Amino acid sequence: MFGKVFVSYIRTRIGFKPLSTIYTPVSSSSLSFDKEACFPFKKWHELNMSQKQEFIQRFVKNYRHQYPSSKTNVSLKGLSIGMDEHNDSPSVFGIFYNDIWKSFKNEQLGTNNDNMKSGSRFSHPSFKQLLIQK
């Protein structure tokens, strides 16, 4: 799991002194890739335009249902208007999607992330149902 990366020397008053060998994961990207490979939901950048627009429409509807008196509803609705005409998807919804994705992934893996506490706006299970499967 860990491999030697390098041995370094530090200059001291008397001369050079070897530092401890620094250990890092052999391939940290491949370890996280394996965990993501078995996760059944796509990331935002993997979605095509119609899937993004579908998520946005469902997200706006769900957010309005969960937080009916929130002023954010007006902004979300305004951002989502005209997506079909312009063949566009506002990137702010990608941030929301990835936050939900990370929250659900951490929950599935049993890791506790300080950024995704149970009190976050997207912690309600209905938001996790909005994720698009692979």
Swiss-Prot record:
It comes from the Eukaryota. One of its GO terms (cellular component) is mitochondrion. Present with 172 molecules/cell in log phase SD medium. This is Uncharacterized protein YMR252C. The lineage of its organism: Eukaryota, Fungi, Dikarya, Ascomycota, Saccharomycotina.
